[in-house]
Amino acid sequence: MYVMKQNGWVELICGSMFSGKSEELIRRVRRATYAHINVRVYKPAIDDRYDDKAIVSHDGTSTMARPIHDAVEILEDVDNNVEIVGIDEVQFFDNNVVDVIEELADRGIRVIVAGLDLDFRGEPFEPVPKIMALAESVTKLNAICPICGSPASRTQRLIDGKPASYNDPIILVGASESYEPRCRHHHEVPFRPENNFATKSWDALKS
């Protein structure tokens, strides 16, 4: 364990859906609030699944949040009294959010960010990989695969109960009616391009 001697850093909480990302963000925000630290929390306006003015975890815990359409709005809203900024569902913002997060941390603000590191295809979900590279602290959470009980690092999108095609839009806001966690081996994406390198390497090993 190390001690931060300077104010201003970035903490990323990432993982699949239903892994507890929002719950962990809420927990950290509440601890700061109990300590009378000035906190502001933001969420993308597109995410109105449970409450349009709060972050609500899948288990029902919540904290108030300001819905925004563009991450730049955070810089316009945060004043010199704010000590911590929380941002949920960061994958719904464009890459400008990376610059916003860096600016906040450089100002001496502790920035706590939560989001999906992989999209429903099982591919890196920008801008989270960039934030991961810049963050001082990264917490990666897993859910539980309902098929086998293994740690679930992927998010399975379901359309009428069937796996969504690789060619579907990347962003589709939903909860348990559209998504469930899956492990690597039970994550299904029809029409996903084959990993030719892996296939050739495996074939070479078998021959």
Curated annotation (Swiss-Prot):
Source superkingdom: Bacteria
Annotated binding of Zn(2+), by residue: 145, 148, 183, 186
Compartment annotation: Cytoplasm
Keyword Transmembrane helix: no
Name this protein carries in UniProt: Thymidine kinase
Entry GO terms, CC: cytosol
Gene Ontology terms: biological process: DNA biosynthetic process; thymidine metabolic process
Reactions the enzyme catalyzes: thymidine + ATP = dTMP + ADP + H(+)
Enzyme class: transferase
Gene name, Swiss-Prot/TrEMBL: tdk
E.C. designation(s): 2.7.1.21
HAMAP family membership: Thymidine_kinase
Entry keyword set: ATP-binding, Cytoplasm, DNA synthesis, Kinase, Metal-binding, Nucleotide-binding, Transferase, Zinc
Organism: Oceanobacillus iheyensis (strain DSM 14371 / CIP 107618 / JCM 11309 / KCTC 3954 / HTE831)
PROSITE patterns, sorted: TK_CELLULAR_TYPE (PS00603)
Xref: SUPFAM superfamilies: Glucocorticoid receptor-like (DNA-binding domain), P-loop containing nucleoside triphosphate hydrolases
One Pfam family linked to the record: TK
Quaternary structure (record): Homotetramer.
Molecular functions (GO terms): ATP binding; thymidine kinase activity; zinc ion binding
NCBIfam families: PRK04296.1-1
